[in-house]
């Protein structure tokens, strides 16, 4: 039988995500909690020896069922053109190590489709990271939209799969993975350009950078000079070379207020010169 749709029906087909009912399903307090607890959206997932393989769906089972029911009910009465698709433009994972760089181990991360029993990487998008490579950013881009259906007893959707290899002798957490994505749901689908999985190695954070600036060194030297109870020695505004390895025999050039020749203050200035402490 030919489809007997109205203009309102066609408007609804353009994007089911504009429906108030669907918004309530996606952003209810329960759905938000499930996204955190079941999917680890925006949370740190610890890779341990007793959790060597982690499969995290991008949609909680309860939310998946409600979304699928919403689209199916609209499809059955002719208001929607399909039973719904899940679209994920990109999945971004931030990976950090929690053990020494000497630990021999690696992580294998990829995006899979729960409709595939083998859980193979989608379009070969898979990234391997050795422990000494971390920290790193990893990204995946699915090339198709996933139908909101049930295959056997599995709710079909995309999932992040993380495998831990090696790390002999390390039973605790060896790496932390924080994944972020934004799932979209619509009655229409598409195919997308194949892009290889991205892997960007990140320089470790230098938390001592702020403490080794010349201003910090100058403050430390000033406090040391104040301890000798000599009010005539003033730190200069000259930049301090913090990269130089200064020995105890090297002297710090300081300026003092001008004094009259032959005065007692001038003689004390020449008799005492503070030294830079090695190891600043």
Curated annotation (Swiss-Prot):
Pfam families given in the database record: 3A
Signal peptide region: none
Coiled coil segments of this chain: none
InterPro entries: MPV (IPR000603)
Keyword Iron-sulfur among record annotations: no
Any GO BP annotation: transport of virus in host, cell to cell
Function: Transports viral genome to neighboring plant cells directly through plasmosdesmata, without any budding. The movement protein allows efficient cell to cell propagation, by bypassing the host cell wall barrier. Acts by forming a tubular structure at the host plasmodesmata, enlarging it enough to allow free passage of virion capsids.
Annotated family: Belongs to the cucumovirus movement protein family.
Full protein name: Movement protein
Organism encoding this protein: Cucumber mosaic virus (strain Kor) (CMV)
């Amino acid at each position: 039988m030919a489809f007997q749709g109205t203009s309102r029906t066609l408007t609804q087909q353009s994007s089911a995500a504009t429906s108030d009912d669907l918004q309530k399903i996606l952003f209810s307090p329960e759905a938000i909690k499930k996204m955190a607890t079941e999917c680890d959206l925006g949370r740190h997932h610890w890779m341990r020896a007793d959790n060597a393989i982690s499969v995290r769906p991008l949609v909680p089972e309860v939310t998946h069922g409600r979304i699928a029911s919403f689209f199916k009910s609209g499809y059955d009465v002719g208001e929607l053109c399909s039973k719904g698709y899940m679209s994920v433009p990109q999945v971004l994972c931030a990976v950090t190590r929690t053990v020494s760089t000497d630990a021999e181990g690696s992580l294998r991360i990829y995006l899979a489709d729960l409709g595939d029993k083998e859980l193979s990487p989608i379009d070969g998008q898979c990234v391997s990271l050795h422990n000494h490579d971390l920290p790193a950013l990893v990204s995946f881009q699915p090339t198709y939209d996933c139908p909101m259906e049930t295959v056997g007893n599995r709710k079909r959707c995309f999932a992040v799969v993380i495998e831990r290899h090696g790390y002999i002798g390390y039973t605790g957490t060896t790496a932390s993975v924080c994944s972020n994505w934004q799932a979209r749901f619509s009655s229409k689908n598409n195919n997308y350009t194949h892009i290889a999985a991205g892997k960007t190695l990140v320089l470790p954070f230098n938390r001592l950078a702020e403490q080794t600036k010349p201003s910090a060194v100058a403050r430390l030297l000033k406090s040391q000079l104040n301890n000798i109870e000599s009010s005539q020695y003033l730190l200069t505004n000259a930049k301090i070379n913090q990269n130089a390895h200064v020995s105890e025999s090297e002297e710090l050039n300081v300026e003092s207020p001008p004094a009259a020749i032959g005065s007692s203050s001038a003689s004390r200035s020449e008799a005492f010169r503070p030294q830079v402490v090695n190891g600043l």
